Swiss-Prot record:
This is HORMA domain-containing protein 2. It is found in: Nucleus; Chromosome. Essential for synapsis surveillance during meiotic prophase via the recruitment of ATR activity. Plays a key role in the male mid-pachytene checkpoint and the female meiotic prophase checkpoint: required for efficient build-up of ATR activity on unsynapsed chromosome regions, a process believed to form the basis of meiotic silencing of unsynapsed chromatin (MSUC) and meiotic prophase quality control in both sexes. Required for the DNA double-strand break-independent, BRCA1-dependent activation of ATR on the sex chromosomes that is essential for normal sex body formation. GO terms for biological process: meiotic cell cycle; meiotic sister chromatid cohesion. It comes from Bos taurus. Pfam families: HORMA. Phosphorylated in a SPO11-dependent manner. One of its GO terms (cellular component) is chromosome. Residues 29-232 form the HORMA domain.
Length: 306
């Protein structure tokens, strides 16, 4: 399966008819469409270049000179239907402005889903009546008047970097299992809300990582109405040949709740991932014990990769 993964690559086309993203973003509805497509394209990129589904599970779309593979419903491959259902569940939460973060997690032991081998984080923010939006990882502010061309450039850059990263990562274990957890803005999300295809999940304060983890910042896109930030955590041995300066965070590898990004409106996170087989656990303060709403899929997905 590793051969399949490494043989897949991004192709260059001079012309295209079926484009990925809208040419203009002038209102919140167009912005929502853009973010949905960017999220679905990113998930498709990950599953395709990591060799999780056969070629028949993907259609082809274009982004500038890039020929992209987009996941589609493939009745011959039930696994693709699972992932599409997860994506549609995320769409529902995005439409309602509840979704704070979607986390695609890969692990190998069905009895120990907290022991992960690779994590893909998609963090979302929403403007409030056109207010300025600030990103955690830079001092740049984005307003609702963000130029459509700038949005397109940022989107192309994010997808290019994601493709570059996926093509340079070492192969996954054959027995990998996929799941996706959804995290919410608790202040606005009803306690009984669950997107289609998801159920109430367990909010754990412990994350184990197989091997030595490394955090890779892929990129961010803001439309002025929504923003999406992408981050990957994988084993350091899988990125040995990668130009790490393009992706890696500087300094100590810090992670927040369940090893994920911390949002400024959430409680403080003082969690660290340590090298070699462990761990992150939060301080046992009253604030860090606050229950967070988490959703998990009704059913996890086990690819047939052997």
């Amino acid at each position: 399966m590793a051969t399949v993964q490494l043989s897949r690559s991004i192709r260059i086309r001079k012309t295209s008819k079926k484009t990925v993203f809208p040419s203009q973003i002038t209102n919140e509805h167009e912005s929502l469409i853009m973010v949905k497509k960017l999220f679905a394209t990113s998930i498709s990129c990950i599953t395709y270049l990591r060799g999780l589904f056969p070629e028949s599970s993907y259609g082809e779309r274009h982004l500038d000179d890039l020929s992209l593979k987009i996941l589609r419903e493939d009745k011959k491959c039930p696994g693709s239907l699972h992932i599409i259902k997860w994506i549609q569940g995320c769409f529902d939460a995005l439409e309602k402005r509840y979704l704070r973060m979607a986390v695609l997690t890969l692990y190998t032991n069905p009895k120990e889903p907290e022991k992960v081998t690779e994590i893909y984080q998609f963090k979302f923010k929403y403007t409030k009546e056109g207010a300025t939006m600030d990103f955690d990882s830079s001092n740049t502010s984005f307003k609702s008047g963000t130029n459509s061309e700038d949005i397109k450039k940022a989107s192309v850059l994010l997808i290019r970097k994601l493709y570059m990263l996926m093509q340079n990562l070492g192969p996954l274990p054959n027995d990998v299992i996929l799941t996706m957890t959804l995290h919410y803005y608790n202040a606005v999300t009803p306690n009984d809300y669950q997107p289609p295809g998801f159920k109430e999940g367990v909010s754990s304060h412990l994350l184990l990582f197989e091997g030595e983890p490394v955090n890779l910042q892929v990129g961010m896109v803001s439309t002025g109405f929504h923003s999406m930030k992408v981050k990957v955590t994988t084993e350091a041995t899988r990125v040995s040949d990668l130009e790490s300066s393009l992706f890696q965070e500087s300094g100590t590898t810090e992670i927040a709740h369940q090893g994920l990004d911390c949002d400024e409106e959430e409680e403080e996170c003082n969690t660290e991932i340590q090298k070699m087989n462990f761990v992150c656990s939060q301080q046992s303060s009253e604030r860090s014990r606050k229950k967070r709403k988490v959703s998990e899929p009704v059913k996890v997905f086990i690819p047939d990769r052997k």
